Amino acid sequence: MKKELLKILREKKPLVHHITNIVTVNDCANITLAIGALPVMAHALEEVEEMVSAADALVLNIGTLTNEQVEAMIKAGKAANRLKVPVILDPVGAGATKLRTQSSKKILEEVKISVIKGNSAEISILAGKGGKIRGVESQSGADDISEAAKDLANAYNVVVAVSGVTDIITDGKRIAYVKNGHPMMGTVTGTGCMLTSVVASFCGVCEDYFAATVEAFVAFGIAGERAAQSSNVKGPGSFKVTFFDEIYNLTPEIIEKDKKVEYE
């Protein structure tokens, strides 16, 4: 892992352009601020190309997608590619409907993605291994999600990050298993979307997108652990507030001390 990456992030304050869903847009903006980056939420087809030209990273999240939004994502993504701005794709619910699956694949074919972040079923489906989605919750169809993630990473020359009890991050060659996190994180809707924003924030200051993604997952998981241990937490509502505070109060020293990562 890149030491002091959080310190660099907070010094540089990368601008993260989001084209994201209407369910979690406010939380994604605030978690981006809490980690030390700057959010901008711009969806209009007429302005996304101009907006991404000022950004350090671009998030494409299909959680509440429309055909017009997918068009805006592709336009922004192509502009980001020309400008060498990292693009992070969150294929929320890929496999749940044809629109979500086809839109995810269309974006992957037309835009050079830097990081794909999804749950096991989303990644398994995009890797061609099958899977089951109920709403946007998942059950992988792959016997070995690590291999499915590596296959997808190699197919698109991209970092693939699979969130779960143990998170898996791979660039097709390197692979990391992150064991930070807490079950309480699953009681708050949008934690996956917020994690994507944190991944983008780190990718905005580190060109090794594998290392940046590992650092983001570790930081996010540690904040969840620390929030869950707080005496202020009585349930999902107080957990969410405390989680934001723990993201804000993270330091490189805390990350180094509490990280749980294994590499292959």
Curated annotation (Swiss-Prot):
User: Under which name does UniProt file this protein?
Assistant: Hydroxyethylthiazole kinase
Name the EC number(s). Answer: 2.7.1.50
- Gene from which this protein is expressed: thiM
Entry-linked NCBIfam families: PRK09355.1, thiM
Can the keyword Lyase be found in this entry's annotation? no
This chain's source organism reads: Thermoanaerobacter pseudethanolicus (strain ATCC 33223 / 39E) (Clostridium thermohydrosulfuricum)
Alphabetical GO biological process terms:
thiamine biosynthetic process; thiamine diphosphate biosynthetic process
Q: In which pathway does it act?
A: Cofactor biosynthesis; thiamine diphosphate biosynthesis; 4-methyl-5-(2-phosphoethyl)-thiazole from 5-(2-hydroxyethyl)-4-methylthiazole: step 1/1
Q: Which UniProt keywords apply?
A: ATP-binding, Kinase, Magnesium, Metal-binding, Nucleotide-binding, Thiamine biosynthesis, Transferase
Biological function: Catalyzes the phosphorylation of the hydroxyl group of 4-methyl-5-beta-hydroxyethylthiazole (THZ).
